[in-house]
Amino acid sequence: MSTPFSVTDTMGFELPELEYAYDALEPHIDAETMELHHSKHHAGYTANLNAAIDGTEMEAMGIEELMVEKFDNAAVRNNGGGFWNHRLFWSTMSPTGGGVPSGNLANAIDDSFGSFDTMKEQFAKAAMTRFGSGWAWLCVSDGGLTICSTPNQDNPLMTGEGVPILGVDVWEHAYYKSYGPGRATYVQAWWNVVDWKAVAENFEAAI
């Protein structure tokens, strides 16, 4: 089993470049939100993570090892989670996203939830019932798929709950400009940019 980002990161972490323009996900996610979210928030987590590990033995550790082994280190947990979570978030969205999954992923969704629509309903519920800031996740766990949510910048890898293959950011900075307090409307719109091909690749890597 591997995760979407199993390659060990050393010599400091770098803010990943997006594979699409900031305005490419409009009208579902607006360009200003994307730019601030990537160039300020994600960049901040990256810089703060590097500062937290600078000059320590942690510089030789990969991001996933850091998140698990240094879970009690608040700076590493918060900023490492923010770095990893956003990297997954960007990579599972696309201007040509939306639609429905196919192949092995579609079969696994049916096996685990009964149908794609039921999975979406359960996922949206996890996103909506997460109090305050956090994330909702679709994970591989024990060969099947599960849904959960985590607070702040935590993720299921940190506690061994599963390998996330898809996640949605429900911090207010991810949606407030376009949707105000309408988290449900944001999550509904987000489905239109989910890159199911990328999610399927994550699934195959994780099983």
Locate the predicted segments by residue.
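Feature for soluble, non-membrane regions of globular proteins
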Residues: 2-207
